[in-house]
């Protein structure tokens, strides 16, 4: 269409772009565009998730400003390696001339120059020789060699400018969470691998000289601007010799300053690493943070991040042994620093928080005996299968209190799912939250982006605020989710309908946290100086860590409760690979529930399974179920036997399994089991992804379940293989998921004949 020309107060010709009555932008004659509204990242996710987007325009396009008095000043929920944007990480990689592995060059299909291809081929041959007798073979050997073959990242970009635009675009995409639809924790774990190349980068031994003319040819203006500033920093004596990590923290502060954020608490697992890494980080913090505060005005504090479960990508490194024991010993060491203000249990919420009660007890004791102002934070209420984790978190802390000990400073991250807040249990929870002065942290974008929330009407923040509960906003990592703090606050305002009074309440909590933190820092700084007593930081903390490890070894108790059995031992006779010559049909309904919830099989649902068994060819398809032998999954096994069918039925089971589930699998007519890399049962959806959705076409029939089956469905939608997904909308817990995937998943009711539709859509199983 045509935009009418207007004259503004300065007698300039301008063009006003409006859509749906909302002013989008002012366009000036010289081509400058002044944006007045935006589509937040969270809305873009919801739009890409469905083929039938139906949010109204006022909840899609939002004014891009907030009243100054209501603008949040803190980010109290974020993670160290999730904070920086892709552009900052790429610029840091160029400045630092990091090693960029061949594995990622291949994985992202990046383009090298002919000279670079020849050089890296020579290097790879040398590396291959080193692993000749490693015992590895096939894909594992290839991966090992490619992981240890590198190109200088600066060389890759500056001496390959003809491909720079293409390569930077691909690398950018790899450094933030999936944008075209909701992601799941599998995507998060993969993303961390790509970000670690930059966040934990290793500088090349031999650096190249950068021609100034080539700097001007960086095809992305934002990256060029960042890189030029980073090179100017080298002229500053205070910044000339800082480490990559210190550089990273400096840029975190600079990015926060742009957003008017002046206080943040960052969770970092490096602060829990024994024998040097944690102490090294503290030493670096004590050098760089005073400078950062002086330059930016941003105060950065840290929380020791303790993994509730290890990340899948690094599980083999730390799963063995009582890893939380070592983490807690290190925590008690680094917590001497005034920059370390608390702890944070992080990671995917797929286990009952009471599993962590021994570790929580030890933290509560530490607060009582050593540091009464130390914060205990727990990620809880992110998973609808564990709705009691918020109340259980509080209970674990209360039951750990020593006689006469007041409730510590407690914050709960997410708080999205709890008991119904209008029920007696929910009202009891609200009273406890208020009485114990507990702060809830909300991150709406990460909730939606990580498939924990599909229906925005279910978000409880407004109810908490109305009940007088202290609430704050966090980001969960701006760079990770491609957002900023303003984007988050706009989403709260326009999608969750928080008003100015709500924001005033949240700002008041922020002010309280910052005020307490400032006093805490002042006191703790004096205590730290006394503790050092003339020693340097490394010397003093190394001595203390050694003492803490000795004391820790005297405590033989496991810090995480686990009564399950090793699946490989109890089901060894059942372990086998999934077939590759047939189409897998996944039946979900029984293994994917919250604890204590049982799936009831309806007569209509049973009839659908009978029809499916009758019409599908056993030579062309097989069934895959979960580990519980309950509900529709158990029903397909029994019907296969009763109807004298000969379908192969396999189960994907967790790495650790209960005695009951193990016995049930052995008693049923299960042809084989595939053992997941995940120890917790709610994480087995990841193995459905690795074993099926990323490798082959499949059919998914989701009858019932909570968050785990929602993740299973999302994995099927996101996978490289083509999955036909059928979702039972009679199940209340699946209804919202079916709606959000409108056009990508086919909803069905158990009293309808969906089987003919399945056969029609999937002729290869006939």
Give residue spans per PLM region.
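A charged, well-structured terminal subsegment
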Residues: 751-765
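Acidic/glycine-enriched connector segments
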Residues: 550-750, 756
